[in-house]
């Protein structure tokens, strides 16, 4: 029964914001978000500390800062409406929380796409034990 509950919770999160954000990342970078960015550098993935390791990691740092600003909107779980039009991401929600979360994800996906050339395999599955420098402020 516990396993069934865990799978149900995971499926709910997959249908929410993180899944949508992953689709945006794939659209802008051509890389699968789960395998390429879920544990990249010091900031891509859950949590974050230390100094961003490259421009791609800095995109995730800025995204974390954006999520901090919209924290009352439960950004990791809030789903929203958006579309792709000629490779542009259009956030289309009238709800202010959903729109704000979508904009955080949109800006991060664009940033990752613009900096895909900085992506370095050595930062994939990067241990947080390497992220010891003083954490920057948002």
Swiss-Prot record:
GO terms for cellular component: extracellular region. Pfam families: Phospholip_A2_1. It comes from the Eukaryota. It catalyses: a 1,2-diacyl-sn-glycero-3-phosphocholine + H2O = a 1-acyl-sn-glycero-3-phosphocholine + a fatty acid + H(+). One of its GO terms (molecular function) is phospholipid binding. It is found in: Secreted. Its cofactor is Ca(2+). It is an enzyme of class 3 (hydrolase). InterPro entries: PLipase_A2, PLipase_A2_Asp_AS, PLipase_A2_dom, PLipase_A2_dom_sf, PLipase_A2_His_AS. Ca(2+) binds at residues 43, 45, 47, 64. The active site is at residues 63, 105. Belongs to the phospholipase A2 family. Group II subfamily. This is Phospholipase A2 EC1. It comes from Echis coloratus.
């Amino acid at each position: 029964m516990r396993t069934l509950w865990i799978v149900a919770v995971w499926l709910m999160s997959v249908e929410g914001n993180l899944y949508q954000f992953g689709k945006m990342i794939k659209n802008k970078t051509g890389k699968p978000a789960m395998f390429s960015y879920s544990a990249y550098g010091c900031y891509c993935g859950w949590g974050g500390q230390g100094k961003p390791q490259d421009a791609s990691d800095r995109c995730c740092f800025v995204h974390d800062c954006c999520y901090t600003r919209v924290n009352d909107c439960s950004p990791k779980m809030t789903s929203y409406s958006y579309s792709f039009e000629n490779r542009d991401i259009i956030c289309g929600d009238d709800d202010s929380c959903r729109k704000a979360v979508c904009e955080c994800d949109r800006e991060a996906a664009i940033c990752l796409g613009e900096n895909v050339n900085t992506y370095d395999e050595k930062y994939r599955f990067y241990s947080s034990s390497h992220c010891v420098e003083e954490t920057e402020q948002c």
